[in-house]
Amino acid sequence: QGTAASGANSDAAVDQTAGEFLYYSGRLVQAAVYYSSNGGASEDSLNVWGNDVGYLKGKIDPYEGKIASIIPQYNWSTTFTASELTTLLNNRGYGIGTVKNAYVSAYTDTGNVYSVTFTGTSGSKTVSREACRTLLNLRSQRFTIGGGGSENAYSVNDTGESVALSAASAVDSSGKSSALSGN
């Protein structure tokens, strides 16, 4: 969302950290990305973007659930009909015919979705990493897929974001912000 989602708190955080730098293994961090919520676990950059960034490793977050009630849009869901999924896949050139089934076919070690398989009347297609999130226009790779069958509708439940440095982790138990080292 970039600067469109900025507010008094984010502006204050930027001002308070002006002139500070992040280092990982003695080198300046080239890409620092942050999230406000990870849904319970972050994810390795390799499992999302396909490139290994040493300081972007997946970890279970034992604290996220404790603050979930105050995180806007922590849990949300959407529903796709088989017809809508068929259109999405055909628009991407996957050509599997009419979608008959959609399911999570692989999870990462932290419980995020690694791949989703769509089965249609003319074949199957497995979509992996970031592509499965963007295909379904989801906020993260921490989602579940349910439904299908006779109702011919698939519900998708999503929580948090996946790959980044936690903005919440930058605040200690007293509420004082602290620098992130990346190690």
Residue ranges, per PLM feature:
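Conserved, single-site charged/polar hotspot
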Residues: 1-183
